[in-house]
């Protein structure tokens, strides 16, 4: 069973911030699949299908690993079937990258997930948000109007890639993503 987790911060205050692009991708993915997040735990919300789970932690970003660990243990999911979607300041707005492993790159939600899962071997889909002077203020602010079209396009592409991934291998998904990379 595949577990796809979109990271963000809960609450209306953070809904339109750069740090919530993981939520945005999951929301669009669920919408495209005509699914709703109908299951809830203390740490998050999710929708379970026979072959996959889409999940959003409702803890603050730096505690995202608690919810991921909870779902992995309860549903006996192998971390090889886990994919995390989150914002990355090392990529420009409009860029995305799929990785099979690596460090958290300063992203505290991903760092907590790596800590809880006890491995860096976690698939991830990083959504570029560019870099600001004050990282904390920057990630907790909305995108500039000039970036809205780019971010909308990359969120759409990310959701489409995940739809493809749900019925294909990760290797095939990476190949398709890389073939389409220059089109985003």
From Swiss-Prot:
Listed under catalytic activity are:
an N-acyl-L-alpha-aminoacyl-tRNA + H2O = an N-acyl-L-amino acid + a tRNA + H(+)
Active site residues per record: 19
Q: Does the keyword Cytoplasm apply?
A: yes
Q: According to the UniProt record, what class of enzyme is this?
A: hydrolase
Residues under site feature: Discriminates between blocked and unblocked aminoacyl-tRNA:
9
Q: Where does tRNA bind?
A: 14, 60, 62
Q: What is its EC number?
A: 3.1.1.29
**Family annotation (InterPro entries):** Pept_tRNA_hydro (IPR001328), Pept_tRNA_hydro_CS (IPR018171), Pept_tRNA_hydro_sf (IPR036416)
- Record PANTHER family: PEPTIDYL-TRNA HYDROLASE
Q: Any idea what this protein is called?
A: Peptidyl-tRNA hydrolase
């Amino acid at each position: 069973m595949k577990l796809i987790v979109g990271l963000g911060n809960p609450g209306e205050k953070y809904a339109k911030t750069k740090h919530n692009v993981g939520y945005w991708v999951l929301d669009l993915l669920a919408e495209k699949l005509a699914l709703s997040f109908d299951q809830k735990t203390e740490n998050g919300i999710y929708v379970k299908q026979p072959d996959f789970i889409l999940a959003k932690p409702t803890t603050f970003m730096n505690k995202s690993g608690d919810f991921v660990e909870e779902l992995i243990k309860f549903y006996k999911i192998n971390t090889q079937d886990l994919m995390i979607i989150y914002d990355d300041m090392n990529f420009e707005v409009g860029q995305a990258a799929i990785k099979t492993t690596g460090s958290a790159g300063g992203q505290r939600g991903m760092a907590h997930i790596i800590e809880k899962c006890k491995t860096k071997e976690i698939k991830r889909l990083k959504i570029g948000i560019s870099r600001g002077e004050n990282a904390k203020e920057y990630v907790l602010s909305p995108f500039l109007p000039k970036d809205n079209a780019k971010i909308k396009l990359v969120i759409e592409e990310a959701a489409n890639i995940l739809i493809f991934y749900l019925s294909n291998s990760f290797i095939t998904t990476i190949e398709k993503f890389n073939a389409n990379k220059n089109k985003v």
